[in-house]
């Protein structure tokens, strides 16, 4: 079964597969939710036929693209008229004599970061974390099976336990029988702190640290050290809630759900490609509850730490 989708602006991931769930058969597979290009793609090369998915930010993509074109290579996959960066990465991989050599070529050539999963013809999955460790890969295990993911929150309901976290630049091969290390990890780690502060799902763990625990503890410390006079703490959903709960406990004030998020119509506000639509989604998905707001001195923990769109767009409502 092969399916490639890309647009998740108006509907969620599962709905894209509702009519085809009965086609999901077999015992091995890879997939990804990408905000850059349709994935996975399938490559036929001297290394054999393989499927690949990537999480990448390639700063020098145009430079590598020009060099590959000068070597008479071509790009069959396009994303919004631009080169599909996953295909570009696959072309770097097939320059190696083995998958490991090819992935190391990616590490050398790419300025930025790139983590990936490769599904080979023999049914094994090669997992490679970017050389700086900026994006995570977590290995899970249960009886007779192994899995790799960027979000450990996907494991509990599938009965997987966290087995290990791949280190920066580490490469492993997974089968149903076990995990084989193909490349040792680098010593230097530069993981993205936004995973705990903003992007991560509350039940996920990165490098052994739980997302909700980090948010709650951050809020707790703020509450213990803040001398502001407030009646209650409120969190802008989603990531602001954990911090506000911690603040409330540290400050010794109640937590009030003064703003709720309506998600059936308005999904995540950073998903749309245009800033105008992102701003609209950010504004429309949050609904204030006046009964919990009026006459109170409120302390809000915001959810949007880049542009501050979530709380800023609701300030007028709060004052009214």
What are these regions (language model features)?
Residues 12, 44, 221, 242-245, ...:
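Feature captures the catalytic cores and cofactor-binding loops of soluble hydro-lyases/lyases
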Residues 54, 294, 302:
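A cytosolic small-molecule/anion-sensing beta-strand core signal
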Residues 80, 209, 213, 273, ...:
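Alpha-helix capping and helix-loop boundary segments enriched in small/acidic/polar residues
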Residues 88-97, 237, 248-267:
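Amphipathic alpha-helical
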Residues 165-166, 249, 291-294, 319-320:
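A structural signal for short secondary-structure junctions
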């Amino acid at each position: 079964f092969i399916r490639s989708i890309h647009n998740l602006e108006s509907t969620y991931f599962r709905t894209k597969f509702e009519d085809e769930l009965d086609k999901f058969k077999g015992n091995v597979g890879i997939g990804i939710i990408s905000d850059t290009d349709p994935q996975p793609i399938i490559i036929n090369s001297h290394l054999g036929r393989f499927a690949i998915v990537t999480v990448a930010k390639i700063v020098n993509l145009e430079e590598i693209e020009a060099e590959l074109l000068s070597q008479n290579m071509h790009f069959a996959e396009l994303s919004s008229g631009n080169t599909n960066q996953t295909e570009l990465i696959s072309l770097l991989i097939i320059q190696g004599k083995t998958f490991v050599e090819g992935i190391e070529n990616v590490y050398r050539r790419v300025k930025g970061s790139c983590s990936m999963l490769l599904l080979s013809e023999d049914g094994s999955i090669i997992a490679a974390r970017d050389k700086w460790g900026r994006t995570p890969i977590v290995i899970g295990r249960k009886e007779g099976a192994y899995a790799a993911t960027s979000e450990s929150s996907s494991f509990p309901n599938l009965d997987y336990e966290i087995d290990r976290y791949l280190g920066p630049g580490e490469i492993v091969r997974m089968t149903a029988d076990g995990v084989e290390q193909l490349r040792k990890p680098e010593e230097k780690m530069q993981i993205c702190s936004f995973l705990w502060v903003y992007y991560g799902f509350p039940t996920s763990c990165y490098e052994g640290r739980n997302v909700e625990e980090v948010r709650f503890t951050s809020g707790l410390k703020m509450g213990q050290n803040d001398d502001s006079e407030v009646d209650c703490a409120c969190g802008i959903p989603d990531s602001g809630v954990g911090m506000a709960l911690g603040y409330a406990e540290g400050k010794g004030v109640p937590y009030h759900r003064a703003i709720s998020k309506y998600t059936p119509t308005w999904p995540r506000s950073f998903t749309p490609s245009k800033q105008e639509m992102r701003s609209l989604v950010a504004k429309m998905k949050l609904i204030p509850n006046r009964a919990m707001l009026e006459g109170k001195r409120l302390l809000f923990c915001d959810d949007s730490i880049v542009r501050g769109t979530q709380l800023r767009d609701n300030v007028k409502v709060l004052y009214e």
